[in-house]
């Protein structure tokens, strides 16, 4: 709820209209909550579960060891690697080419990490993993706990309107459940979109398929 309030304050200052609210995973819950409190044209919730129950192991990792938490999310969240490596700009070099590789060691701007199993995989995951960087240790822990505790009121669920839901058929973290109470007012043919052969991070795994779905939704 506090995250929703912050977004509302920002939107009030910006004085925007004809808003389309969107969020992925935890951010999708914020967008959903916001959609019941702030005027909008449409809300798009990507890869959300409700209730979004986060396991104790992940919560413990997020509190004490962010690397372990991110590894957990990568292990269960990713179904496939993108065919084309995502290019990012950083430290004056494009892509992940700035890495140094030798005998399983990966040298990144954040230090040297030894990866015994698959250093190439670690390199390909870098553009996604860098999204989880945080300035304070507790950020991920707080966010994940808020997922577990988040609930909409009954009247909010009944009043959900013009909400589009995007799921991925190989997502182990936020599975599509046609019986979910959030989908009571949804038209399952027009409001629910399912990406094929994709896990929890479609913008990383299959951006082309995601773009096609976006075009269907927004056209």
Which residue stretches match the model-derived regions?
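Catalytic active-site module of serine/aspartate enzymes centered on a nucleophile-bearing elbow/loop
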Residues: 188-219
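Conserved loop-alpha-helix segment in the C-terminal half of the alpha/beta-hydrolase fold
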Residues: 159-198
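Active-site loop/oxyanion-hole signature of alpha/beta-hydrolase fold enzymes
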Residues: 1-22, 208, 212
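Residue-level signal for the nucleotide or nucleotide-sugar donor/cofactor binding architecture
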Residues: 2, 135, 174, 205
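Conserved hydrolase catalytic core segment
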Residues: 16-54
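Conserved alpha/beta-hydrolase catalytic His-Asp/Glu region
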Residues: 60-158
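Conserved donor sugar-nucleotide recognition element shared by glycan-biosynthetic enzymes
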Residues: 3-4, 66, 203
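A short beta-to-alpha transition loop/helix N-cap that caps and shapes the active-site region
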Residues: 49-58, 70, 80-81, 173
